[in-house]
Swiss-Prot record:
Pfam families: Helicase_C, RapA_C, SNF2-rel_dom, Tudor_1_RapA, Tudor_RapA. Its EC number is 3.6.4.-. GO terms for molecular function: ATP binding; DNA binding; helicase activity; hydrolase activity, acting on acid anhydrides. InterPro entries: Helicase_ATP-bd, Helicase_C-like, Helicase_RapA, P-loop_NTPase, RapA_C, SNF2-like_sf, SNF2/RAD54-like_C, SNF2_N. This is RNA polymerase-associated protein RapA.
Length: 968
């Protein structure tokens, strides 16, 4: 093409320079000025990597002054183009804009514009873009969306609760599962779903001070949720940045004490417009009608302002009726306003529970029971269902299940209360106790005697604490020269046990970090035992490394030595051997220790080894825990209640262990109290509530569905393809691990979600559960989500050119592969993507307008194509530009017809599902007062907005690929 001064060209290799202007031409060279950057480039006239830029009628162009022109016609004089059209800002027609006056900061937004401007992408990027569109659309539609990306085992009851509650508008519920059933994980799953769906953006977690770091770690490690921890220092720092310090972060964890201490701070917190608040250990909020505690009032004030509330608490039976009512009152003060009325209501639910038990028993239903069921559901004609349920006909089980579902919907608090027990959930191991009685060394005997004389002024509590840890007493007297580990028989026993069981992973827990550190040194120096240490002095990253070393099967540590505080929130199901080097002070801490191994998913029975010194507080405590509470071999829901009631006597025995008079009778008294309380708890079990909480077949179906998706290889292939194209380095490690590090030439300087020093990932859920240093990558992981956004929000892969070597077709045959996207713009909280995610429509159109896409599958066709370099590609495009324009025009009507089908189907699905959900809630609100009117109103509003936005859905060309047939 001849060059003329004033023409506009673009560089094929440096498109970031913008639009260039020809400023000098001689016989061999041409000079382009790029005004956007002020740079000049010199090119050879023949075969230079630049492309002529000429717009077409229908395009909108921008002048260097900023105004825009809709092009109606084009004229050329002496090789320079002028555009004639309508000016958008003044509506003036017949306006002439010479190409030399075009804006130099030109951005080609449409794929066809980029194609004609020579801004061609690599073929593999086009393929990645299409796959990204396809997979993203599929993922949005899955029923398990929001539930798959967590580093958790697939536990049916947890998935059921998260699926039910996570999809609600502003959920207000009580999570009251027994210990070890994963309330924290359920809460995290709900938070994760609410955030992903756009139902929540600002989340507050209020916890006891000792659990702050545990929550921080759990949210980050399991759900990839980065919370900010607010304490006095962080609050003071945030005050410099905002009038309301809590506005500086979207997701915050703070302690209840931090909020309670300062009235102004509480007001700021209440004003911060949270969408969801989680309160852990909510059973500690003391309430009575006459005198609610300050802590209760604090949470009550926040609960009045925050639309979504999750309260994590002990089981209702443990709490007692009044305390249970107090939690429900926080969730819905209008519904639960009168305690006496609440007690009366609860009595009316027993016939419902009886009816469910009857249906579950698969026995014939008598006349009295039939009348009861008719009375309970009097507003509906259930006679046909009852007849089927009471027969031997096909459909009997389905009829009974439907009746149970109908009863559950009417159950008083099953929408606001979820409570699972170990009795109702399978998958827990046995626990076996091994007591190792050891002699008390003379060194300790002497230290204890001297301590008794010197600490006469200490309280019984303080003396009891001292007596539990004789090594601490000894070390205090001896100072740095004390070496208790040289004579303590527990150390000798531990070394012997570990050397005899070198093939077993062993978790050793002791109360103090100093003890753990000293034991590590002894084990390493004396026996060469590899032991990782885990204590509160380590950073989260250091704890991760210690946990990963312990978890590793190859060259991993045999032992993990944990302090009491350091082990909070960490679980090691892959190990089944536990040694308690000493004992904790109360039953809750004991259960917390055992809970490190005793989790759902533990496949072996747990062996609990307790080496204790005779004639010490340890000997008293091990006997009390085992014989008085049965706390080692079974979970002990009564532990705290018994502990509180006998605290003074227990402390007296621990403070003076040599005085054992009456100890046996005391322990028998505790056991009797434990048995009585346990029987009361069992009697108070609510079978219907348990049935609703564990989800039954629904929960199992969710788990099976996710497990099947976990085994799909598509994610691995896509992710590795994404990392290659983005420029992320990958290094394979053993055990299904990959180390990712930023490359030198990435598509973006900083890839969101990838740390500067890299990270270790795995696509294997089980591997992620045992390797805490490895991130579990799923479709919901930030690295994948950010990768999808990076590709799809920009123009990566939006136009390409390929050669098809096929002798069955004439040379020069032209095909255009077009990817249209059907989409609707709407606020995220409407979750339009459930019905209409950005959906790709793939077309393969020839010169005659025939769409061949249905006959040519993408992946197999893509493998037959060959790449073209950018320079050759630009020449090909210029040669067939008019044909491509015509093919795109021919495709538009076909694309519109396909898009309309997609939109109509989405609208029909949305109308059916949302109307059914609304009708169900409206019908149930007549028989179940726990269905809030604001929930019904929100659903109706949501339905109307969803349908309205779907009516306005549109489509656009997202990417295209030019394919030219060759025989070479």
């Amino acid at each position: 093409m001849p060059f003329t001064l004033g023409q506009r060209w673009i560089s094929d290799t440096e498109s970031e320079l913008g639009l260039g202007t020809v400023v000098a031409v001689d016989t061999r060279m041409v000079t382009l000025l790029f005004p956007a950057t002020g740079e000049n480039r010199l090119y050879a006239r023949n075969d230079s990597p630049i492309t002529r830029v000429v717009f077409n009628p229908g395009d909108t162009i921008t002048s260097h002054e900023g105004w825009q022109l809709d092009v109606d016609e084009i004229t050329t004089a002496n090789g320079v183009v002028s555009y004639i059209g309508t000016r958008l800002d003044t509506s003036e027609t017949g306006v002439v804009l010479r190409e030399v006056m075009l804006d130099s900061k030109l951005v080609f937004g449409k794929p066809q514009d980029r194609l004609f401007a020579g801004q061609l992408d690599r073929m593999d990027r086009f393929a990645l873009r299409f796959r990204a569109r396809k997979y993203q659309s599929e993922q949005y539609r899955l029923a398990t969306s929001g539930l798959r990306g967590m580093r958790t085992s697939l536990i049916p009851h947890q998935l059921h609760i998260a699926h039910d509650v996570g999809r609600r508008h502003a959920p207000r519920v009580l999570l009251a599962d027994e210990v070890g059933l994963g309330k924290t994980i359920e809460a995290g799953m709900i938070i994760h779903q609410q955030l992903q769906a756009g139902r929540a953006e600002r989340v507050l977690i209020v916890v006891p001070e000792t659990l702050q770091h545990q929550w921080l770690v759990e949210m980050l490690r399991r759900f990839n949720l980065r919370f900010a921890l607010f304490d006095d220092d962080r609050y003071a720092q945030a005050q410099l940045d905002s009038d309301n310090p809590f506005d500086t972060e979207q997701m915050i964890i703070c302690s209840l004490d931090f909020v309670r201490r300062n009235k102004q701070r509480l007001e700021k917190l209440a004003d911060a417009e949270w969408d969801l608040m989680v309160v852990d250990e909510a059973h500690h909020l003391v309430w009575s009608e006459d005198a609610p505690s300050r802590e209760y009032q604090v949470i009550e004030q926040l609960a009045e302002q925050v639309p979504g509330i999750l309260l994590l608490t002990a089981t209702p039976e443990q709490l007692g009726m009044e305390s249970h009512f107090a939690r429900l009152r926080l969730l819905d003060p209008d519904r639960f306003h009168d305690f006496a009325q609440f007690v009366e209501e609860q009595k009316h639910f027993s016939p419902i529970a009886d009816a469910v038990t009857l249906l579950l028993a698969d026995q014939k239903i008598g006349n009295d029971e039939l009348n009861l069921l008719n009375d309970l559901m009097g507003e509906q004609d259930i006679e046909p269902l009852l007849q089927t349920a009471n027969s031997d006909r096909e459909g009997k089980l389905a009829a009974r299940q439907e009746l149970i579902s109908m009863l559950m919907d009417r159950h008083g608090t099953s929408r606001v209360l979820f409570r699972n027990t170990r009795n109702g959930v399978k998958g827990f191991p046995k626990r076996e106790l091994h007591q190792i009685r050891l002699p008390l060394p003379t060194q300790y005997q002497t230290a204890i005697k001297v301590s008794g004389i010197m600490s006469a002024r200490k309280t019984a509590d303080e003396r009891a604490q001292d007596m539990l840890y004789p090594e601490q007493i000894y070390q205090e007297f001896e100072g740095d020269s004390g070496t208790w580990w040289n004579f303590d028989p527990r150390v000798e026993w531990l070394m012997g046990y570990l050397t005899s069981n070198r093939d077993k992973k062993v978790l050793v827990i002791c109360a103090k970090a100093a003890t753990a550190l000293q034991l590590e040194q002894v084990l390493r120096e004396r026996e060469g035992i590899r032991a990782a240490v885990f204590h509160e002095g380590l950073s989260i990253i250091e704890r991760d490394r210690a946990a990963a070393w312990f978890a590793s099967e190859e060259d991993g540590a045999q032992v993990l030595l944990c302090s009491e505080i350091g082990s909070e929130g960490r679980n090691f199901q892959f190990a089944s051997q536990m040694v308690m080097f000493d004992l904790p002070f109360n039953p809750d801490l004991l259960e917390q220790r055992i809970g490190r191994l005793d989790r759902i998913g533990q496949v072996h029975d747990i062996q609990i080894h307790v080496p204790y010194l005779e004639k010490t507080a340890q000997a008293v405590l091990v006997q009390w825990y085992h014989e008085g509470l049965d706390a080692f071999e079974h979970t002990c829901p009564t532990g705290r209640a018994v502990y509180d009631s006998v605290y003074t006597q227990l402390i007296a025995y621990l403070a003076a262990p040599e005085n054992s008079e009456g100890l046996e009778a005391f322990i028998q008294h505790c056991r009797k109290q434990h048995d009585t309380l346990k029987a009361q708890l069992e009697q108070g079990r609510d079978r219907l509530l348990e049935l609703n909480s564990n989800g039954g077949e629904k929960g199992q179906a969710l788990a099976d569905m996710i497990a099947e998706q976990d085994n799909n290889i598509e994610l691995v292939n896509f992710a590795l393809n994404l990392f290659d194209i983005v420029g992320i380095n990958q290094e394979d490690r053993s055990d299904n691990l990959i180390v990712l590090t930023p490359g030198d030439h990435m598509l973006v300087p900083d890839f969101p979600g990838l740390p500067e020093d890299g990270c270790t990932i795995t696509f294997d859920r089980n591997q992620a559960l045992s390797r805490e240093d490895a991130q579990y990558v799923s479709w919901e992981h930030p690295i994948i989500r950010n990768g999808l956004d990076l590709i799809l929000s920009g123009d990566t892969g939006s136009c390409a050119i390929s050669l098809l070597k096929n002798k069955a077709l004439p040379v020069g045959t032209l095909l255009v592969e077009l990817i249209y996207v059907v989409e609707a713009q709407a606020p995220k909280h409407l979750q339009l993507t459930r019905f209409l995610p950005p959906t790709p429509i793939r077309m393969m159109v020839d010169r005659k307008g025939n769409n061949l896409a249905a006959k040519v599958e993408f992946e197999s066709f893509n493998r037959q194509l060959n790449a073209v370099n950018r320079h050759t590609g630009s020449k090909l495009v210029n040669a067939v530009q008019s044909d491509v324009h015509e093919i795109i025009t021919l495709s538009e009507d076909q694309a519109a017809a396909e898009a309309r089908k997609v939109i109509d189907a989405a609208r029909q699905e949305a109308d059916e599902k949302l109307s059914a959900e609304l009708s169900r809630l409206q019908a149930l609100s007549a028989v179940n007062p726990n269905i809030r009117q604001d929930e019904i109103d929100a659903l109706e509003s949501n339905r109307q907005q969803v349908l309205s936005n779907l009516d306005e859905a549109g489509w656009r060309l997202d990417a295209l690929r030019l394919i030219v047939v060759t025989h070479q």
